[in-house]
From Swiss-Prot:
Protein source organism: Azorhizobium caulinodans (strain ATCC 43989 / DSM 5975 / JCM 20966 / LMG 6465 / NBRC 14845 / NCIMB 13405 / ORS 571)
Name of the protein: UPF0178 protein AZC_4000
Superkingdom assignment: Bacteria
Record-stated family: Belongs to the UPF0178 family.
Database matches in InterPro entries: UPF0178
C-alpha cells in the first residue's frame, strides 16, 4: 500500500504582495489550497481553498508562521529574502513577485547581496529603492508559478 501523495499548498507573504489576484487565479485553475498570511486583514475571494491567516503585528511574525509550516511540495510567494532562504532550506519552492525563483543554488548569493545592499543603504551610500513593479514582472511571475506547480505535479505531488 503506497502513501497518499502530499498536496501542493501555496503560502503567500501577503502584506505587500502585488500578485495576489494572479495567485488566486492560478490556485483556482489548479485547485490548490492557499494560505494568505498578513499582519492585517486582507480581502480574499470566497473560496474554501483560500485561507486568510492574520498574525500578530511585529517583525517577522508572518515570516515565522510561514517558515514553520512549509516543506517540500509547497510553494511560497515572497519578496522577503531572509524568509525565502528559510523556506528554501525547508525544501519549499520559493518565487518572488517579479518571477525570480529562489533555489538552493541561488539563495546564498541572493541573501549576501541583500545584506550588502542593506548595509550600503544604512551607511547612506544608496538612497534609491527597488525598481517599480511592471507588467513584465507580473508575466514572469505567472510563468514561474505555473512552472513550479507543473514540476511538483510531475514529482508526484497532488492538488
Amino acid at each position: 500500500m503506497s502513501a497518499r501523495p502530499e498536496p501542493i499548498t501555496l503560502y503567500v507573504d501577503a502584506d505587500a504582495c502585488p500578485v495576489k489576484a494572479e495567485i488566486y487565479k492560478v490556485a483556482e485553475r489548479h485547485a490548490l489550497h492557499v494560505h494568505v498570511v498578513s499582519n492585517q486583514p486582507i480581502a480574499i475571494p470566497r473560496d474554501d481553498r483560500i485561507h486568510r491567516v492574520v498574525v500578530a503585528s511585529g517583525p517577522d511574525v508572518a515570516d515565522d508562521w510561514i517558515a514553520e509550516r512549509v516543506s517540500r511540495g509547497d510553494v511560497v510567494v515572497t519578496a522577503d529574502i531572509p524568509l525565502a532562504a528559510r523556506c528554501v532550506k525547508a525544501g519549499a519552492d520559493v518565487i518572488a513577485p517579479n518571477g525570480k525563483a529562489h533555489t538552493e543554488a541561488t539563495i546564498g548569493a541572493t541573501l549576501a547581496t541583500r545584506n550588502l545592499m542593506d548595509d550600503l543603504r544604512s551607511a547612506g551610500q544608496i538612497t534609491g529603492g527597488p525598481k517599480p513593479f511592471s507588467p513584465r514582472d507580473r508575466s514572469a511571475f505567472l510563468s514561474a508559478l505555473d512552472l513550479a506547480i507543473v514540476r511538483l505535479k510531475r514529482a508526484g505531488f497532488t492538488t
